[in-house]
């Protein structure tokens, strides 16, 4: 077994503001031979931050007018998102190399058909019916289309006789999925392995340019011989099947689909002539994983954002919970347990907590008596977050590589080698690579959700949140249950994530005359992953909302504790200066301030008046002990001092209540500004201010402070409406530039 010497450990790149990733090189001690195990444990460093930033910059360039260029080899996930979701322009690489490759493969097919050679899907039946033969390949293609146009869609947009249980148009795929699939299928066909014409790929691009999107059934693909049924609706739109409908016209609302018309009508409206498909082209369009890859690419594009957002919120959660930066110290992660995802995650959070006035950034050793009764470490959701998030980062990096490769592959059968003239029968349409990537991603999304939920629950719970009020109530908790609804809803979200995390691939069924006895269910797995993304974004939105409220309350608490320290000092001097010298006053003031802060932390569930009475009462026993201790040999003086305690307590309670009420009014009325916690934050401040200033979400509690004098929902919108604004900012990418700028 190899022994690693401590003095041979060297860190090649320390943590820095650039959030670079640590690499640890361990040199074996020469007294023992190298171990094959030790020599194999040097995993590649992850850099999800770089992936995220590069993808964001690439997407912005497409949104600014740069076209997505298809050459069969360089299509990125960001490019898929740009064309699918933001209507980015698409251009085909029309270089001689690309067009010649297409021409060669097309010529192979044409020659073999002319020679009467038997080719699967051109002169034979399909799948389990491949024992049939025909010399009419065009009619065979028509039969293929007829067979695959079997999906269930709403037959009309007219009012229904009965209110449906679900949105009828939920039977159709979102347009973004279809646009992404068309893009990926074009990129596969342009590689020149499918025997199709250049004109066919151009015609597909004509539909994208005209913003004509086929209405495609949501369900019906097992993603085994590719996504046959969904792609058949794309093919039907290309050749103008009047029974195939498309989305056309302007988008007038975020709710509901665009105008739905027949493909013939849409093509005529945009002066696009339908294409007559040649032999092999029917199958060439259908027999691929484009829909599975599209949904997977779009899912991963957002999954990267949510994974990094989870890390950012963990840093903000550490601030809101008065946690410690030491959880993310480089020694723990880069030296002691150098899993690459763990290292990168710790690196991100470590840097984000630099300069925070809420988190403990410099830990000090204490005696047993000094930290008695205090939790010595942060709880697991904060302290072990790098170890929990890190493996998800690694799986996500692997999934990104898999799906990027899938988007630049030929997923067809048969395949045509234009150089040798050979036709290959295989199974590149089997999308299990996509399925595995989606199963991993969906499970990771659940784990991230579980972490976020645990942190959020801790933040809302007064027994765990280090002195914050229950349910993050900014006013008396007996009449303010602010975040309790968020707590309950978050439990629902994470439970659903757990259900969605179950694999789809374990439910594969034999299909199509037992020819497709194994299949991938990749599209279904991708759909489930999209649903998981939606649920996780709801959970993250709720947590970010709660964090901002907690940060404001922590800022208020900071002012309150400073004010209480001053009150305690003033009242001790006023009450006991006749009996104590300056040294004793100073010593007892320090003791009292510590007691008051502890009492404040333990009484956060009480209304203000009762709370301050209890806090003041907590000084009674220490006062009696102090005033009857060694400092008082004079019994008469001690007795006189003891008689002042009731009045002293009353003044502390009254002034403490007035201070708390004054601070509540100031914070809730905007007297401390719209973002009162900003001055305590450093690197996470832009995210907090995005919520408070850009989205205009105020600290909650004004209605409660004013006893609902104007009714509920008059002075402020609902909590759900505010969380919805955050969710929309995440969903629509408005928060992404803020996150990018953090790094």
Curated annotation (Swiss-Prot):
Pathway: Phenylpropanoid metabolism; trans-cinnamate biosynthesis; trans-cinnamate from L-phenylalanine: step 1/1. GO terms for cellular component: cytoplasm. CDD domains: PAL-HAL (cd00332). Pfam families: Lyase_aromatic. GO terms for molecular function: phenylalanine ammonia-lyase activity. The modification 2,3-didehydroalanine (Ser) is found at residue 225. Belongs to the PAL/histidase family. This is Phenylalanine ammonia-lyase 1.
């Amino acid at each position: 077994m190899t022994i690693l010497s401590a003095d041979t450990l060297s860190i090649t790149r320390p943590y820095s503001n650039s959030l670079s990733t640590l690499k640890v090189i361990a040199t074996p001690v020469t007294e023992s031979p190298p171990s094959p195990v030790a020599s194999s444990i040097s995993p590649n460093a992850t850099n999800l931050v770089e992936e995220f930033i590069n993808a964001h910059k690439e997407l912005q360039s497409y949104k600014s007018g740069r076209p997505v260029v298809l050459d069969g080899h360089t299509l990125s996930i960001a490019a898929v998102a740009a064309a699918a979701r933001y209507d980015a322009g698409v251009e085909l690489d029309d270089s001689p190399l690309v067009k010649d490759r297409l021409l060669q493969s097309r010529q192979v097919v044409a020659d073999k058909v002319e020679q009467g050679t038997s080719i699967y899907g051109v002169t034979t039946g399909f799948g389990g019916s491949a024992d049939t033969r025909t010399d009419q390949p065009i009619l065979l293609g028509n039969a293929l289309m007829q067979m695959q146009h079997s999906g269930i869609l709403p037959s009309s947009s007219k009012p229904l006789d009965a209110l449906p249980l679900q949105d009828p148009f939920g039977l159709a795929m979102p347009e973004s999925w279809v646009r992404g699939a068309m893009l990926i299928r074009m990129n596969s066909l342009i590689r020149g392995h499918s025997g199709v014409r250049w004109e066919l790929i151009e015609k597909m691009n004509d539909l994208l340019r005209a913003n004509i999107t086929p209405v495609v059934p949501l369900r019906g693909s097992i993603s085994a011989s590719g996504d046959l049924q969904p792609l058949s609706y794309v093919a039907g739109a290309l050749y103008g099947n009047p029974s195939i409908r498309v989305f056309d016209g302007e988008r007038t609302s975020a709710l509901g689909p665009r105008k739905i018309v027949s493909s013939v009508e849409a093509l005529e409206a945009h002066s696009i002539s339908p294409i007559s498909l040649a032999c092999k082209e029917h199958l060439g369009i259908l027999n691929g994983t484009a829909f599975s890859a599209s949904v997977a690419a779009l899912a991963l594009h957002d999954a990267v954002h949510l994974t990094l957002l989870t890390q950012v919120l963990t840093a903000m959660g550490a601030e809101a919970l008065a946690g410690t930066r030491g959880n993310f110290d480089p020694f723990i992660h880069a030296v002691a347990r150098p899993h690459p995802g763990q290292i990168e995650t710790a690196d991100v959070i470590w840097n984000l907590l630099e300069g925070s006035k809420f988190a403990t950034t410099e830990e000090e050793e204490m005696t047993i008596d000094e930290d008695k009764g205090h939790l010595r470490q942060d709880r697991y959701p904060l302290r072990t977050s790098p170890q929990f998030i890190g493996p998800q980062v690694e799986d996500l990096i692997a999934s990104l590589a898999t799906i990027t490769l899938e988007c630049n592959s030929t997923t067809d059968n048969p395949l045509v080698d234009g150089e040798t003239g050979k036709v290959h029968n295989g199974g590149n349409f089997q999308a299990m690579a996509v399925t595995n990537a989606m199963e991993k991603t969906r499970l990771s999304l659940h784990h991230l959700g579980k972490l976020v939920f645990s942190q959020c629950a801790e933040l809302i719970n007064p027994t765990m949140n280090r002195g914050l009020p229950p349910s993050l109530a900014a006013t008396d908790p007996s009449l303010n249950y602010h975040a309790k609804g968020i707590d309950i809803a978050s439990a629902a979200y994470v439970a659903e994530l757990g259900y969605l995390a179950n694999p789809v691939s374990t439910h594969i069924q034999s299909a199509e005359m037992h020819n497709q006895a194994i299949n991938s269910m990749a599209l279904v797995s991708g759909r489930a992953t999209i649903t998981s993304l939606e649920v996780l974004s709801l959970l993250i939105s709720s947590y970010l909302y709660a964090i901002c409220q907690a940060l404001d309350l922590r800022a208020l608490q900071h002012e309150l504790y400073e004010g209480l320290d001053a009150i305690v000092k003033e009242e001790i001097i006023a009450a006991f200066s006749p009996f104590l010298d300056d040294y004793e006053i100073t010593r007892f003031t320090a003791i009292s301030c510590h007691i008051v802060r502890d009492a404040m932390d333990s009484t956060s569930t009480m209304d203000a008046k009762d709370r301050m009475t209890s806090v003041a009462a907590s000084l009674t026993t220490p006062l009696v002990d102090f005033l009857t201790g060694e400092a008082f040999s004079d019994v008469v003086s001690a007795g006189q001092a003891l008689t002042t305690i009731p009045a002293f307590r009353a003044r502390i309670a009254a002034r403490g209540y007035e201070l708390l009420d004054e601070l509540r009014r100031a914070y809730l009325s905007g007297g401390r500004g719209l973002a009162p916690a900003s001055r305590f934050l450093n690197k996470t401040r832009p995210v907090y201010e995005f919520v408070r200033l850009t989205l205009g979400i105020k600290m909650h509690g004004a209605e409660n402070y004013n006893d609902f004098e104007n009714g509920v929902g008059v002075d402020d919108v609902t909590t759900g409406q505010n969380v919805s604004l955050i969710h929309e900012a995440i969903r629509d990418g408005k928060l992404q530039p803020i996150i990018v700028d953090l790094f």
